[in-house]
Amino acid sequence: MFGIGMPELIVILVIVLVVFGAGRLPEIGGALGKSIRNFKKASDGKDEIEIKPEKKDDPSK
Protein backbone atom coordinates (compact mmCIF):
# COMPACT_ATOMS: atom_id res chain seq x y z
CA MET A 1 0.00 0.00 0.00
CA PHE A 2 2.22 2.79 -1.31
CA GLY A 3 5.11 1.50 0.80
CA ILE A 4 3.48 2.74 4.00
CA GLY A 5 3.42 0.25 6.83
CA MET A 6 1.74 0.23 10.20
CA PRO A 7 4.49 2.20 12.02
CA GLU A 8 4.31 4.98 9.43
CA LEU A 9 0.51 5.15 9.70
CA ILE A 10 0.75 5.45 13.48
CA VAL A 11 3.26 8.30 13.18
CA ILE A 12 1.01 10.09 10.68
CA LEU A 13 -2.00 9.64 12.99
CA VAL A 14 -0.07 11.06 15.96
CA ILE A 15 1.02 14.08 13.91
CA VAL A 16 -2.56 14.71 12.76
CA LEU A 17 -3.78 14.37 16.34
CA VAL A 18 -1.22 16.92 17.56
CA VAL A 19 -1.87 19.39 14.74
CA PHE A 20 -5.68 19.32 14.70
CA GLY A 21 -6.51 18.16 18.22
CA ALA A 22 -8.80 15.36 19.31
CA GLY A 23 -11.93 17.51 19.15
CA ARG A 24 -11.74 18.18 15.43
CA LEU A 25 -10.82 14.66 14.29
CA PRO A 26 -14.43 13.48 13.77
CA GLU A 27 -15.19 16.62 11.76
CA ILE A 28 -12.10 16.14 9.59
CA GLY A 29 -12.84 12.44 9.13
CA GLY A 30 -16.41 13.17 8.07
CA ALA A 31 -15.30 15.79 5.56
CA LEU A 32 -12.67 13.43 4.16
CA GLY A 33 -15.20 10.61 3.85
CA LYS A 34 -17.70 12.88 2.10
CA SER A 35 -15.01 14.05 -0.32
CA ILE A 36 -14.02 10.49 -1.17
CA ARG A 37 -17.69 9.50 -1.73
CA ASN A 38 -18.25 12.50 -4.00
CA PHE A 39 -15.11 11.70 -5.98
CA LYS A 40 -16.15 8.06 -6.45
CA LYS A 41 -19.66 9.12 -7.43
CA ALA A 42 -18.30 11.58 -9.99
CA SER A 43 -15.84 9.08 -11.43
CA ASP A 44 -18.60 6.48 -11.91
CA GLY A 45 -20.38 8.82 -14.34
CA LYS A 46 -20.23 8.43 -18.07
CA ASP A 47 -17.26 9.90 -19.86
CA GLU A 48 -19.23 10.94 -22.91
CA ILE A 49 -22.38 12.97 -23.21
CA GLU A 50 -25.23 11.19 -24.95
CA ILE A 51 -27.12 13.42 -27.34
CA LYS A 52 -30.44 12.23 -28.70
CA PRO A 53 -31.92 14.07 -31.67
CA GLU A 54 -35.22 15.76 -31.04
CA LYS A 55 -38.23 14.46 -32.91
CA LYS A 56 -39.78 17.25 -34.94
CA ASP A 57 -43.36 17.24 -36.09
CA ASP A 58 -43.63 16.59 -39.79
CA PRO A 59 -45.43 19.64 -41.26
CA SER A 60 -46.33 17.77 -44.49
CA LYS A 61 -48.85 15.55 -42.69
Curated annotation (Swiss-Prot):
Topology of this chain in the membrane:
Single-pass membrane protein
What does UniProt give as GO cellular component? TAT protein transport complex
Gene3D superfamilies, per database record: 1.20.5.3310
Q: Which GO terms describe its molecular function?
A: protein transmembrane transporter activity
Question: Main role?
Answer: Part of the twin-arginine translocation (Tat) system that transports large folded proteins containing a characteristic twin-arginine motif in their signal peptide across membranes. TatA could form the protein-conducting channel of the Tat system.
> Its family?
Belongs to the TatA/E family.
Which PANTHER family does the record cross-reference, listed alphabetically? SEC-INDEPENDENT PROTEIN TRANSLOCASE PROTEIN TATA (PTHR42982:SF1)
Q: How does it assemble?
A: The Tat system comprises two distinct complexes: a TatABC complex, containing multiple copies of TatA, TatB and TatC subunits, and a separate TatA complex, containing only TatA subunits. Substrates initially bind to the TatABC complex, which probably triggers association of the separate TatA complex to form the active translocon.
Query: NCBIfam families given for it?
Result: PRK14861.1 (NF011430), tatAE (TIGR01411)
User: Which protein, by its recorded name, is this?
Assistant: Sec-independent protein translocase protein TatA
Native organism:
Geobacter metallireducens (strain ATCC 53774 / DSM 7210 / GS-15)
**Classification lineage:** Bacteria, Pseudomonadati, Thermodesulfobacteriota, Desulfuromonadia, Geobacterales
